[in-house]
Each structure stands twice: as structure tokens, then as C-alpha cells.
């Protein structure tokens, strides 16, 4: 499949970079969390509160299975999607996976700046929880086809598009 799949921690810039990449490549943007919200008619926060995390992860798996038929898309995943059910391997079948690696200190700054957030796993700006999440997820994220270690938006954008074109053989 010829898709770009963006993975990484919450607040790593997946949605923002996804929008820009989709404009450059003239690909449709798919945000997995937004798709789940539309399917369920509820926000992610409400889904977690009413049905729990396991239910939400089942919905993510449904989304992955639907995406296997897609091509020429930029897919921005929820931060936990690659982690559960060995989804990282399924995502790599869907397209070129890009891990947006942002230093923990920068993620904490972004979380504090944003304040109370709609992300259910980042409630109450719990920096210790974010730190644990980071440590637990990094090994799986690093299985992506490429890793972008840059907090500069424009440089990241250029690097991702170049790496994708190289992967695709353009």
C-alpha cells in the first residue's frame, strides 16, 4: 500500500504534520481518532468514560482493517494505536510508517501549554504518567520504517516527504 502512517506519542505533531503532508502529496488525510469519533458519535474522552479503553482499542483494530484497502492516504494514528494487539506490524503493511520522536521534555512542555486536554490518558496534566507512557511505548514506536527526531516543523515535513519518496522508489 502506498500510504504514509504517522505514529508517536500524544502531542508529537501527527495531526499537524499529517495535514501538511497530505497537501504536499495531494493525498487524503485520515485521522484514526476522528474516524472512531464519527463511527461512535462520541468524543474519544466519552468513549473511554462510557465503554473503557478495551472497547476503544477494538475500534482501532476495526479502523486498521478498513485501512488495509486504502491507498494514497496520510494516516495520523492515535498515540496508543501502534502499541496494542501488535498493531505496529499491521500498520507497516498499510504503508510507510513514520515515528515522530519528540523528546519527553518537549512533550511535557506541550502538555502543560495545552492545559486540560481531550486526551483521556493525559488527564490532569500528569507528567509522571506521560513519562511512564513514553518509556513503555518507545520500543514499539521505533519499529517504524523511519524515525524523525526533529521538533522543527518544516524540517520534519521535508524529511518525511523525501523518505517516503525514497521508500516508494520515486
Swiss-Prot record:
Top-tier EC class: transferase
Main localisation: cytoplasm
Residues where Mg(2+) binds: 15
A GO BP entry: amino acid biosynthetic process
The keyword Ribosomal protein is assigned to this record: no
Catalysed reactions, semicolon-separated: shikimate + ATP = 3-phosphoshikimate + ADP + H(+)
Cofactor-binding details, from the entry: Binds 1 Mg(2+) ion per subunit.
Keywords for this protein: Amino-acid biosynthesis, Aromatic amino acid biosynthesis, ATP-binding, Cytoplasm, Kinase, Magnesium, Metal-binding, Nucleotide-binding, Transferase
Origin: domain of life: Bacteria
GO MF, one example: shikimate kinase activity
Cofactor(s) of this protein: Mg(2+)
Pfam families recorded: SKI
Gene3D superfamilies: P-loop containing nucleotide triphosphate hydrolases (3.40.50.300)
Localization: Cytoplasm
Associated pathway: Metabolic intermediate biosynthesis; chorismate biosynthesis; chorismate from D-erythrose 4-phosphate and phosphoenolpyruvate: step 5/7
CC terms in the record's Gene Ontology section: cytosol
UniProt-listed Enzyme Commission number(s): 2.7.1.71
Binding site for substrate: 33, 57, 79, 137
Quaternary assembly: Monomer.
Known function: Catalyzes the specific phosphorylation of the 3-hydroxyl group of shikimic acid using ATP as a cosubstrate.
Family: Belongs to the shikimate kinase family.
Protein name as catalogued: Shikimate kinase
Organism, as annotated: Clostridium botulinum (strain 657 / Type Ba4)
Primary gene name: aroK
Amino acid at each position: 500500500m502506498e500510504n504514509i502512517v504517522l505514529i508517536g506519542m500524544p502531542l508529537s505533531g501527527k495531526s499537524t504534520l499529517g495535514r501538511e503532508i497530505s497537501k504536499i502529496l495531494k493525498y487524503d488525510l485520515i485521522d484514526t481518532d476522528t474516524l472512531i469519533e464519527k463511527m461512535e458519535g462520541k468524543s474519544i474522552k466519552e468513549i473511554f468514560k462510557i465503554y473503557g479503553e478495551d472497547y476503544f482499542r477494538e475500534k482501532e483494530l476495526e479502523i486498521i482493517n478498513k485501512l488495509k484497502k486504502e491507498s494514497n492516504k496520510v494516516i495520523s494514528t492515535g498515540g496508543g494505536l501502534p502499541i496494542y494487539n501488535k498493531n505496529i506490524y499491521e500498520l507497516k503493511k498499510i504503508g510507510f510508517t513514520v515515528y515522530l520522536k519528540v523528546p519527553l521534555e518537549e512533550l511535557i512542555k506541550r502538555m502543560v501549554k495545552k492545559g486540560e486536554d481531550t486526551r483521556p490518558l493525559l488527564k490532569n496534566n500528569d507528567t509522571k504518567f506521560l513519562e511512564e507512557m513514553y518509556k513503555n511505548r518507545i520500543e514499539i514506536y521505533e519499529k517504524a520504517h523511519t524515525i524523525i527526531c526533529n521538533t522543527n516543523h518544516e524540517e520534519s515535513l521535508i524529511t518525511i516527504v523525501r523518505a517516503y519518496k525514497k521508500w516508494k522508489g520515486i
